[in-house]
Regions:
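Hydrophobic faces of well-ordered beta-strands that scaffold small-molecule active sites
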Residues: 4-6, 91
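Vicinal oxygen chelate
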Residues: 14, 24, 64-68, 74-86, ...
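Residues that flank catalytic or metal-binding motifs in active/ligand-binding sites
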Residues: 56-58, 87-89, 134
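Short beta->alpha transition motifs characteristic of CBS
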Residues: 122, 139-147
Length: 147
């Protein structure tokens, strides 16, 4: 079955971030749970992984809402990665109800920054946006008509 998912790189705190998301969305990690860099078999053409990086998250999956899967990894500097957060990507959530929208908005913005409070918009949605405490940007669009 085809699917689209969002893949997030973190600077050594993927497990913390995904445990937070797991508590927000009340779901469990998918696949084989948390895969660690220590799970990578040694390869001839690759230098050995530093001990400090072995427990980092190589891959993790979490179903969030509407069948969407959030995936992530730590991006170790020893492997040439550098994480730079920008303002060009949002994860857009479209909950079924205003109550669910408010619940998710409050949880994800806690410890982060509200960029637009939830409010009724001219296009007919109950809309708001925030950046969570891990630097991930979220938009909320609820089209429930009753308040």
């Amino acid at each position: 079955m085809s699917r689209v998912s969002t893949y997030l790189n973190f600077p050594r705190n993927t497990e913390e971030a995904f445990n937070f998301y797991k508590s927000v969305f009340k779901t469990q990690f998918g696949g084989n749970g948390i895969a660690r860099f220590s799970d990578i078999p040694p390869q001839e053409d690759m230098p050995p992984l530093p001990d400090v990086d072995k427990n980092l998250v190589m891959h993790i999956e979490l179903p969030i809402t509407g069948g969407h899967v959030l995936m992530g990894t730590d991006a170790p500097e020893s492997m040439g990665f550098s994480v730079n957060f920008g303002n060009n990507v949002y994860i857009n959530l479209e909950p079924d109800t205003r109550a669910e929208t408010k619940k998710l908005f409050d949880a994800l913005s806690n410890g982060g920054k509200v960029t637009m409070d939830l409010q009724d918009m001219f296009w007919g949605a109950y809309y708001g946006s925030c950046t969570d405490k891990y630097g991930v940007q979220w938009m909320f669009n609820c089209v429930e008509t009753s308040k």
